[in-house]
Amino acid sequence: MQFYDFKEIEERVILIGVQTEQDEDVAASLDELEELAATAGAVTVGKVIQNREAVHPGTYIGKGKIEEVAALLAAYDANGVICDDELSPAQMNNLERELDCKVMDRTLLILDIFAGRATTSEGKIQVELAQLRYRSARLVGLRESLSRLGGGIGTRGPGEKKLETDRRLIRTRISALKAELAQVEKHRELIRGKRTRGNLKTAAIVGYTNAGKSTLLNTLTGAGILAEDKLFATLDPTTRVLELKDGQQILLTDTVGFIRKLPHHLVEAFKSTLEEAKYADYIIHVLDSSNPQAELQMHTVYETLRELGATGKKIITLLNKQDQVQGEALRDFRADYTVKCSARTGEGLEELKDVLVKLLAESQIYLEELYTYKEAGKIQIIREYGSLLSEEYREDGIFVKARVPAEIFVSVMPKSHK
């Protein structure tokens, strides 16, 4: 199990989940919560699940389960609990009072991990904004709960700085961060516009956290992105050019990983980053085919894409980590294209490239034209933005066979074209 490297104190926690008819598998969700807790530097010493029609509106779990959790806290010398859902301010305050310990929820935990992962100025702005929005509604309970240990999960902002706890100062800081983020978003839109004008198609690499997205981009392009076997190892999007056959190119963008119950504070704060998938021409969905929860993770990814408005695009599903699959292989899921691969070993990646070439061909127009030697500049544009299949030098000019993006087809036609 992975542990976070800037841990101030060891936190021993009890995990709490509520199984309702709407929840598919709370036990698996708590396993994931345990991994999240470990990533943030906490040790899980116990898990409690309550079957209920709905979560308790006042305390998340019922009185009997609260007593059970209190006994576990004492028995295992634990100093906090983490609930598998986002708690309301009232639930957090009441549970903290009943248990007399530090109370956290999945959202607080994920925000804490993001705070430690953010490296760029944009990422730090987005994370701090999400943290402060979450805290602003929970100041009274959080101030008491988080002060119990003087540090640890929930107290750290990006760069290890302490988060603000004064409501007035939080409002001021949120306004400043929103203004900074607006400038960053303008810059991102400018870059996106330049890509569009460059006529290069873009494929967004999406997937559940730790599915192998960064490893895929590194293997394909040598991007040099941090690729660890940890949840949310990558927060900041990275774009690289992938060289394909016949001189064709496509832009690949790595994105932040998705997860069940992704906090809406993060979705809102990371909107400009997540929208890389919305504005991409194609989606490459990386699925960890060795994970027992692969099907549930797939549905989470599709639901998140739907919420982002990133539907209606051609999707390539990569059944990744084939080198780690044991027993019955994962069945092929619905997608326009499905490729079995291992981003780590490179298995299947040539097939992925072939699919990308096919997709590019579908978006291009085939031409056979004779260009005068004075029109060689147009051939250079074809070479740069399309696929130059062949060129034959003749006395009266250069005969070209090529595929070009529809957007530049008219502009690269020779004057002799009728």
Kindly give the residue locations of the regions a language model identified.
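Conserved C-terminal guanine-recognition region of P-loop GTPase G domains, centered on the G4
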Residues: 29-38, 70-75, 87-101, 247-248, ...
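N-terminal accessory targeting/assembly segments
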Residues: 1-112
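NTP-binding/hydrolysis catalytic cores, primarily Walker-type P-loop NTPases
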Residues: 363-418
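Canonical P-loop GTPase G-domain recognition
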Residues: 101-151, 158, 311-316, 321-373
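Flexible beta-alpha connector loops of hexameric P-loop NTPases
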Residues: 20-25, 55-59, 117-122, 161-162, ...
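Switch II of P-loop NTPase G domains
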Residues: 2-5, 27-31, 54-70, 236-237, ...
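Alpha-helical coiled-coil heptad-repeat register
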Residues: 126-129, 133-136, 140-143, 164, ...
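Conserved G1/Walker A P-loop phosphate-binding module
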Residues: 7-10, 148-267, 271-278
